[in-house]
UniProtKB/Swiss-Prot annotation:
Residues 1-40, 446-478, 517-545 are annotated as: Disordered. SUPFAM superfamilies: ARM repeat (SSF48371), Nucleotide-diphospho-sugar transferases (SSF53448), Trimeric LpxA-like enzymes (SSF51161). The modification Omega-N-methylarginine is found at residue 19. This is Translation initiation factor eIF2B subunit epsilon.
C-alpha cells in the first residue's frame, strides 16, 4: 500500500524556471547559452523516515523517531530545512513505522504548502524493512531522474552540499559515470561529543582524488588490517583517516538505486559501500568522499547523540538552525534569545529565586516555580515545574509535570510524563509518554519506564511495522496488570522495562541501545547500524516469512556442503551456490555468516547417530574447516564479520556443553587457517558484557592457554615491528 502527496501541477518546473530566470532567460543570447550548456535538472532527495531498528524503543512505540522533538522541533523538520537550504526542490519521504503520524505532521507543516520551495512527496508502505527496500522501490517507480541526496529523517545539518555536488557531477562527466556516490564527512577528533562510537570509521582514501579505497567501522577495536594492495601502485599516496564523523549524507547517482535492485543482499548503505569496494574491479564503480571542516552534520542514532546534538543546537553550533530562528514558521515554537544561551517562548512564567544558569530552552506556556536551578536543559511547551526543582541536562517534552523537590539529571521525560514530589532521577533515565513516578522515590541510573508492559512486546512484534501493531492489546494487558510501587512509587503508573526472565545482560543491552553507552557490534545501522538485524530483532520477527526463509536457507546450505563433500565440489563453486541461495531467499551477509558457522560446526554431529565425545568431534571437524576455509574467508573479511563468527562459535559451544573442552582447538584451527585474526579473537575473549555461561566458557583451561599464547605471539610481533 502506497500513498503520495501530489504537489501542485508544474510546481517543480515552475520553481526551476524562477531560479533559472524563467524560460528564454532575461536578455539577449540567453537561448544560445542554454543550447550550449544545458542547466542541471532540479535537485531531488530521498529521505528515509524510518531507522528500521529498535534503538529508541520503548520511546518510539508511541511516536516515530523522526517526530521526536529536538530543542522542541521535530527531527524531520531539521532534515527538510537542511535539504531545502541546500537547493533540493523535490523530496521523496519514505515512511513505514507510524506512517500516518508522519504524514499528518508533514501535511500540516510548511513543507506541504503551495509556496514551499521544496515539493515533498510522501510514500508509505508496510513492506519496507530496510534502506535497501526503499531504494529498490525508488528504482521500480523510476522516481529519480539524475543525481540525488540520500538522508535519514534524523539528520541535523547546516552543510551546503553545492561544492560537493559540483565535484560529484564533474567526476561523473570526466570519468564516464564511474563514480556513483559521494559520502559527506565532517572533520572531527575522536573524542568529540558528537562522535557516535557505533558509527566510528577508519577510511583509506586516495590523496589526489578523494576516492574511498577502504571503509571499515571500528567496532571498538584498536588495531586494523588493510589489504596490502591499497598501498601498491598509488602515485599520489593513500591517507588513513580516523578523524572523520559520518554525516550520513550521500550524493547518489541514479545507478545507486539500480545497484540495490541488482543486489538483494544490500540492505544498508554499509552493505552497498562494502559491496562496491570489494567488487570495484569487476563492477567498475567508485565511491568518493567530501570532507567539511566548519559546517555541522550528525545523525541522532541514540539518546547519547540526541543529547549531544540538542546541546549543539542550543549552543548555536548549527547556525542558522537555532531555536529563535523558528524555521518551521510555527507560532508555538517562537522564542527569544538572551545571554548565556537562554531561550524563552511566549507566556513563560519564572518563579522568585529560580535561576536559569546557561544553555536553557523554555517552551511556550511553561510555568516554573520558585527557587529552581535549571542548566543545560530543554523544557517543552506547556510544562509545569514545582518549587525547589533541580534540572541538569534534562530533556522535558510537551506537557511534562515535575512536582516540588524533584531532581532530574541527564534524563529524558516524554510527552505528559509526571514526576511527583521528592523524586530523584539518576542519569540516563527515560520516562516515556504519560508515565507517572513517585512520590519519594529514587530511580537508579539507566531506568526506563513505559506504559507499555515489556511482556506485551512479543505480542506486538509480528506487526511491528504497522501503525496499530497490537497497541490496543498492549493497553488491555496494562489494565489487567498492576504497577509495582517499588519500581515507580505508590502513585506511579508504568512498567520498568525488565521482564521477569530478563537477566542483567539484557537490562544493560536496553540501556546501551537507548543511550549508546558502549560499543554495539551490530549497528549500522543502521542502524544505521545498519547492516542487518541482530539476534534480538530476529527473535522479534517470530512467525514471519523471513525466519522461515532463514531456516530453509540453513537446510539448503547444509545440503550444499554435504553434496560438496560427497562430490568433491570446489570451494569456488560452493560459494557460487551459496550466493545464489542468498539471493533466492533474500538473506543478509551477516545471516550467511551465522548460518555457515552454525552448519559447519554442526556438520560432524549431523553425520553421526550417536553422541560424539570432544576429541572425536575435533578429529572430524578440523579437516572440514581446512577443506572449506576458502568459503569462510569469502564471507569473513571485516572486523565485525570476525566478531559475528566468534559469537556463532560461542553460541554453538554453549548449546553443546559436552564439547566445550575442544573450543580451543577449534579456534586454533580457525586462526591457523587465517579465517579469524588474533586481535579479534582477543577482543572477543575480553568482552565484558557476556552471560554467566559465557564467562564460564572463558574459564576453560585450554582456551585460556590458547589466549595466553595468542597474547604472547602478539607481543612478540609488536616487538619485531
Amino acid at each position: 500500500m502506497a500513498t503520495t502527496v501530489v504537489a501542485p501541477p508544474g510546481a517543480v518546473s515552475d520553481r526551476a524556471n524562477k531560479r533559472g530566470g524563467g524560460p528564454g532567460g532575461g536578455g539577449g543570447g540567453g537561448g544560445a547559452r542554454g543550447a550550449e550548456e544545458e542547466s542541471p535538472p532540479p535537485l531531488q532527495a530521498v529521505l528515509v523516515a524510518d531507522s528500521f531498528n529498535r534503538r529508541f524503543f520503548p520511546i518510539s512505540k508511541d511516536q516515530p523517531r523522526v517526530l521526536l522533538p529536538l530543542a522542541n522541533v521535530a527531527l524531520i523538520d531539521y532534515t527538510l530545512e537542511f535539504l531545502t537550504a541546500t537547493g533540493v526542490q523535490e523530496t521523496f519521504v519514505f515512511c513505514c513505522w507510524k506512517a500516518a503520524q508522519i504524514k499528518e505532521h508533514l501535511q500540516k507543516s510548511k513543507w506541504c504548502r503551495p509556496t514551499s520551495l521544496n515539493v515533498v512527496r510522501i510514500i508509505t508502505s508496510e513492506l519496507y524493512r530496510s534502506l535497501g527496500d526503499v531504494l529498490r522501490d525508488v528504482d521500480a517507480k523510476a522516481l529519480v531522474r539524475s543525481d540525488f541526496l540520500l538522508v535519514y529523517g534524523d539528520v541535523v545539518s547546516n552543510i551546503n552540499v553545492t561544492r560537493a555536488l559540483e565535484e560529484h557531477r564533474l567526476r561523473r562527466k570526466l570519468e564516464k559515470n564511474v563514480s556513483v556516490m559521494t559520502m559527506i564527512f565532517k572533520e572531527s577528533s575522536p573524542s568529540h561529543p558528537t562522535r557516535c562510537h557505533e558509527d566510528n570509521v577508519v577510511v583509506a582514501v586516495d590523496s589526489a582524488t578523494n576516492r574511498i579505497l577502504h571503509f571499515q567501522k571500528t567496532q571498538g577495536l584498536r588495531r586494523f588490517s588493510f589489504p596490502l594492495s591499497l598501498f601498491q601502485g598509488s602515485g599520489a599516496g593513500v591517507e588513513i583517516r580516523y578523524d572523520l564523523l559520518d554525516c550520513h549524507i550521500s550524493i547518489c547517482s541514479p545507478q545507486v538505486a539500480q545497484l540495490f535492485t541488482d543486489n538483494f543482499d544490500y540492505q544498508t548503505r554499509d552493505d552497498f559501500v562494502r559491496g562496491l569496494l570489494v567488487n570495484e574491479e569487476i563492477l567498475g564503480n567508485q565511491i568518493h568522499m567530501h570532507v567539511t571542516t566548519r559546517e555541522y552534520g550528525a545523525r541522532v542514532s541514540n539518546l547519547h547523540m540526541y543529547s549531544a546534538v540538542c546541546a549543539d543546537v542550543i549552543r548555536r553550533w548549527v547556525y542558522p538552525l537555532t531555536p529563535e530562528a523558528n524555521f518551521t514558521d510555527s507560532t508555538a515554537q517562537s522564542c527569544t534569545h538572551s545571554r548565556h544561551n537562554i531561550y524563552r517562548g511566549p507566556e513563560v512564567s519564572l518563579g522568585h529565586g529560580s535561576i536559569l544558569e546557561e544553555n536553557v530552552l523554555l517552551g511556550s506556556g511553561t510555568v516554573i516555580g520558585s527557587n529552581c536551578s535549571i542548566t543545560n536543559s530543554v523544557i517543552g511547551p506547556g510544562c509545569c515545574i514545582g518549587d525547589n526543582v533541580v534540572l541538569d541536562r534534562a530533556y522535558l517534552w510537551k506537557g511534562v509535570q515535575v512536582a516540588s523537590g524533584a531532581q532530574i539529571h541527564q534524563s529524558l521525560l516524554c510527552d505528559h510524563a509526571e514526576v511527583k514530589e521528592q523524586v530523584t532521577l539518576k542519569p540516563h533515565c527515560v520516562l516515556t509518554s504519560q508515565v507517572v513516578v513517585g512520590p519519594n522515590i529514587t530511580l537508579p541510573e539507566g531506568s526506563v519506564i513505559s506504559l507499555h508492559p515489556p511482556d506485551a512486546e512479543e505480542d506486538e512484534d509480528d506487526g511491528q511495522f504497522s501503525d496499530d501493531s497490537g497497541v490496543n492489546q498492549a493497553k488491555e494487558k496494562a489494565k489487567l496488570k498492576g504497577y509495582n510501587p517499588a519500581e515507580v512509587g505508590v502513585a506511579g503508573k508504568g512498567y520498568l522495562w525488565k521482564a521477569a526472565d530478563m537477566n542483567t545482560e539484557k537490562e544493560e543491552e536496553l540501556r546501551q541501545s537507548l543511550w549508546g553507552l558502549t560499543i554495539n557490534e551490530e549497528e549500522e545501522s543502521e542502524t544505521e547500524s545498519e547492516r542487518s538485524m541482530d539476534s534480538e530483532e530476529l527473535d522479534s520477527r517470530a512467525g514471519s516469512p523471513q525466519l522461515d526463509d532463514i531456516k530453509v536457507f540453513q537446510n539448503e546450505v547444509l545440503g550444499t556442503l554435504q553434496r560438496g563433500k560427497e562430490e568433491s565440489i570446489s570451494c569456488d563453486n560452493l560459494i557460487l551456490e551459496i550466493n545464489s541461495l542468498k539471493y533466492a531467499y533474500n538473506i543478509s551477509l551477516k545471516e550467511v555468516m551465522q548460518v555457515l558457522s552454525h552448519v559447519v560446526l554442526e556438520f560432524p554431529l549431523q553425520q553421526m547417530d550417536s553422541p560424539l565425545e570432544a576429541n572425536r568431534y575435533c578429529a572430524l571437524l578440523l579437516p572440514l574447516l581446512k577443506a572449506w576455509s576458502p568459503v569462510f574467508r569469502n564471507y569473513i573479511k571485516r572486523a565485525a564479520d570476525h566478531l559475528e563468527a566468534l559469537a556463532a562459535i560461542e553460541e554453538f559451544f554453549l548449546e553443546h556443553e559436552a564439547l566445550g573442552t575442544c573450543i580451543a582447538k577449534v579456534l586454533m584451527g580457525f586462526y591457523q587457517l587465517e579465517i579469524l585474526a588474533e586481535e579479534t579473537i582477543l577482543s572477543w575473549f575480553g568482552q565484558r558484557d557476556v552471560t554467566d555461561k559465557g564467562r564460564q566458557l572463558r574459564k576453560n583451561q585450554q582456551l585460556q592457554r590458547f589466549i595466553q599464547w595468542l597474547k604472547e605471539a602478539e607481543e612478540e610481533s609488536s616487538e619485531d615491528d
